[in-house]
Amino acid sequence: MLKLIKIEIEGFKSFADPISINFDGSVVGIVGPNGSGKSNINDAIRWVLGEQSAKQLRGLNMDDVIFAGSKTVKPQEKAMVKLTFKNEDAIEETKQIFTISRLLKRGQGTNEYFYNDQPVRYKDIKNLAVESGISKSSLAIISQGTISEIAEATPEQRKAVIEEAAGTSKYKLDKEEAQKKLIRTNDAIDKLQGAIKELERQVNSLDKQASKAKIYLEKSKALESVEVGLIVNDLNFFNEKLNNLNTSLLEVEQQRNDLELNIQTYESSISQTVHFKTEVESSIQEITSKLDNLKNALSEINLQEARIEERRKLIISGEIVVDQKTKIEEIKKQVESLKIQINASKQREIELDQQLTRLNAKANSLKLQENDINKEIGVLLEKKSAAAANINILKQQFENKSFLSKGIKTIKDNSFLFDGYIGLASELFKVESEFSLAIETVLGAALNQIVMKTSEDVLQAIDFLKKNLSGKATFIPLTSIKEREVREDHLLVLKGQKGFLGVAKELIEFDTQFNKLFGFLLGNILVVDNVDNANRIAKILDHKYTIVSLEGDLFRPGGTITGGSKLERTSILNYDIKIKEHTNTLKFAEDQIHDLKIKQQTIYNEIETVNSTIQQVKIEANSINSKLNILNEELNNLKLNASEIFKEQQEDQESLNLSFDSEKLNIEKQISTLTIELNSKKDRLTNLISEQGKGETKKQELDAKLRKLNTQHSDSITEQNRAKFLVEQNQKRLSEHYKLTLEAASEQYSLDLDIEQARHFVDSLKKELKELGNVNLEAITEFEEVNQRYQEKKQYIEELTTAKSKIEEAISDLDKIIINKTTEIVNLVNNEFNMVFQKMFGGGKAEIHFTDKNDILNSGVEISAQPPGKTIKNLRLFSGGEKAIIAISLLFAILKARPIPLCILDEVEAALDESNVIRYVEFLKLLKENTQFLIITHRSGTMSRVDQLLGVTMQKRGVTSIFSVELSKAKEMLKDELK
C-alpha cells in the first residue's frame, strides 16, 4: 500500500508560513473553524498532483494560489507544495520513500515539477500519479458536492465514476488519442489522394517535357561540341584581323600625316609662287606704266615739234608780233608756277621713296614671318602626328586590357554575366592631375580591384574564374565593407597644419552611390604637399593614419615610409591620364595650326596689299619723274628772255630740232629696253603660272591620295568595327550560352570538321533545336523530383492505409478492454454495493446496472436502491440524507472493490445524522487497510473515531496554522459549528 506520510506547504493560499504535516494513521481527521483554511489542504494536494485549472482551485488565475498577504503578513513571491509517500507493500529494508513537489513563482506563469527534488515534466508527475493510483480523480478527492453529484447525476455522468474505478481512463485516453490519430490519418490520406492525383498529372506532363528536354540537351551538346570550336576559330580569325587592321590603321595614320606634311609643303610652295607671281605681275604693270609714260613723252615731243614748227612758220611769215614786255611777264609767272610744281613733285617723290622703303621692309618682314609660320606648322604637324599615333597605341592597349591580370580581364570581358558587377575601382572616380600620383600611389593594386554589389556576386565571379581556369582577381563587395574615417579631433588638428591638402576621399569626384566604397578605400588617407610636411604630420598624429605626398611618398600607420623615383604606372587611371595628355597635345597642335594658318592667310593678304601699294607708289613716282623732266625742260625754255628766245627760235631752230631728235632717240631706246624687260617678265610670269599649275596639280594629286587614304581609313574603321562587333557577339555567345572564356574554350574544344561543314552542321542543329519549340530544361530535374515525390507519397499512402488499419484494430482492442474492465468493475461493485447498502441502511437492497447492455461503451450506469420498508426506486424521490447514504454506499463499494492508496473526504458526512455518521466512520475503518483517508470534518462522531486528529486555525489573521489536537480540544475549537 502506498501511504502519504508527510505534506509540506509554503506560500500556498493561506499557508504563508512553511508548515510540515506528518500523517501517523490510516484515517486522519482534519478539523477547524470555517474559513481557517482546511480545504486549502485539499487544494494543495490537488495542485501538486497536477491540477491545471485555476477555477478548480477556486481562483481566477494560477497566481491566485500564491499567498496574497494580509494586514500583518507581507505577500509571498512563490508557492511550493511537497508530498512524501512511502510504499508499505515493500519489505522493511527496501520500503521506498519518494517525494513529488510543485513550485510556482509570482509573475512568471511557469510551473516547476520535482521528483525527489529533481526537475521533471508535468507529464512525468501525471503518469506517476495515474500509475500509483494517487491522481486527482473523483475517487481520490471526494467532497460534499461530489456526493450530491453522484446522487443527482445522469447515468452517463455516473458511469464516469465507475470507469475511474475500472481504470479505463488510460485506455479511453489511448482510444481518444488513437481516434485523433485516425482522424489525422484519414485527413492525411484524403490530402495525399488529392496530392497524388495532382502529382500524377504533373508526372505525365513532365515526362513528355523531360523527353523533349533530353533530346534538346543531346542536340545542344552536339551543337556545343562544334559551335564552340567554330566560335574559337572565328574569334582567332577576327582577333588576328583586328590586329592586322590596327597595324594597317597605324600605317594609314602615318601615311595621312606624311601626306598632310607634303600638302602643307606644296601649299607653302604654291603660296611662295603666288607671291613671286604677284611681284612679277607688279613689275610688268610697272614696266607697262613706264612704257606708257615714255610713249606719252614721245608723243609730247612730236607734238612740241609740230607746234614749234608751226610757230617758226608764223614768225618767218611775220604773222606773229611779239610784245616782249608782256611776254616776259607771262614767262615769269609761268616760271614761278613751274617752280612750285617742281618743288611739290620733288617733295612727293621723296615721300613716295620713303613709303616705298617702308613697304619693302614690311614685305620682307612679312615674308620672314611667313617662313617662321611654315616652320611652326611643320613642327606642329609632326607633334600632331606623334600624338595621334600615341593615342591609337594607348587606345589599342586599353582595348586589349594588356595592363590587367588574366583574372581581372576575364571578369571585365564577361561583366554582362554578373548582375552585381559594377566596375574597376579606378573607373568609378575622377581626380585632378595635381592629385593623381598621390591617389594612385596610395590605392596601388586596389585601383584594379573589381567592385561588386554583394559577397554572393563575388562568389559567383570566383566560381566563373575557377571553372574557366582564368587566374585570380581581388573583389570589393559593397555590402560587406565598412567606411573608414579620420577622427573629428584629429581633423581639427590637421586643418591648422602647413601642407595638409585634405582627406583623399574629398579630393576626388565620384557618384554619391559609391560614398561607402571610397570611404572604405580613402576615408582615412591624408594627402600632404611634400615629404617633409608628411613626416611632420605623421609624427603629430603618432603614425595613426596613412599619409601620402603629391610626389607619391607614402607614410603608413606604424611608421613605415615608402618613397623614391616615380615608376611607370599601368592602371586604367594612368591610361586615362595619358590619353587625356596626348589628346590635349593633339588638340593644342590642331588649334595652333589653325591659328597659324589664319595668321598666315592674313600675312598673305597683307603682302598682296603691300605689293599692290608698292606698285601704285612706283607708278606714281615714274609719272612724277616724267612730269618733272618735262617741267624742267619747259622751265629752262622759259628762262630765256624773249629776245633770246626769238633769236634762238630763229637761230637754233635746227639745234632744237636736234635736241628733240636726241630726246626722242633716248626715249625710243628706253622703250626698246623696257619692252625687252617686259617680255622677260612675261616669260617669267608664264613660268610661274606653269609652276603654280604644276604645284596645284601635285597638291590635287596629294589631296586625291589623302581622300583615298581617308576613304581607306574610313573603310578600315568600318571593317574594324564590324570585326569588333563579331568578336563581341562571339564572345557573348561563348560567355552567356556556354559560360566559357576564349582561353578555356580553346583548351577544351577543337574543330575537327571543315569550316563550311561545321557552319552547315551548326545551322542544321540550330534549325532542329528551333523546330523543337519551347523547351523546359528544368523538366528533367522537375520530373525526377516530382516523380520521386509521387512515388514517396504513393508509398506513404500505403503506409498510412496500413497504419489506419492498425489504428482501427487498436481502437477495437481498446473498446474490448474498456468493455471488459467496465463490465468487470460493475459486477465487482454490485457484489459489494448491496452489502454496504444493507450495513448503512440496516437492510434493504441496491444494485447498479447498464442502461443498455447491448452497447456498454455508450451505455450509462443506473442505481437501483430500496431501503428497508420502502418501495421507492427513483433516486430523485429520496430525501437528501438518503441520497447521501446511497452515494456514500456506492463510493464505499467502489473503494472496497477497487481500493486506492489515498482518498480525501471533505465533509462528505455533513448531511448525515449522528447514527449514520457513526456507521460512516466505522465502515471507513474497514477500508483503511487498503486506503489512507484524510477526512475534513465538523462531526464529533467522525472526530472521535479517527486514528489521528489535526487542528487547523488562523492564529495570525489570514495565515493558516496546523497542529495535532486531542478530541476535547477539537470539540472546543468547533463548539460554534457543533451548535
UniProtKB/Swiss-Prot annotation:
Gene Ontology process terms (BP): chromosome condensation; chromosome segregation; DNA replication; sister chromatid cohesion
GO cellular component terms given for this protein: chromosome; cytoplasm
Domain of life: Bacteria
First-listed, main subcellular location of the protein, grouped into a coarse class: cytoplasm
Annotated InterPro entries: P-loop_NTPase, RecF/RecN/SMC_N, SMC, SMC_hinge, SMC_hinge_sf, SMC_prok
PANTHER family reported in the protein's UniProt record: STRUCTURAL MAINTENANCE OF CHROMOSOMES PROTEIN 3
Assigned protein family: Belongs to the SMC family.
Assembly description: Homodimer.
Domain notes: Contains large globular domains required for ATP hydrolysis at each terminus and a third globular domain forming a flexible SMC hinge near the middle of the molecule. These domains are separated by coiled-coil structures.
Function of the molecule: Required for chromosome condensation and partitioning.
Name listed for the protein in its UniProt record: Chromosome partition protein Smc
Species in which this protein is naturally found: Mesomycoplasma hyorhinis
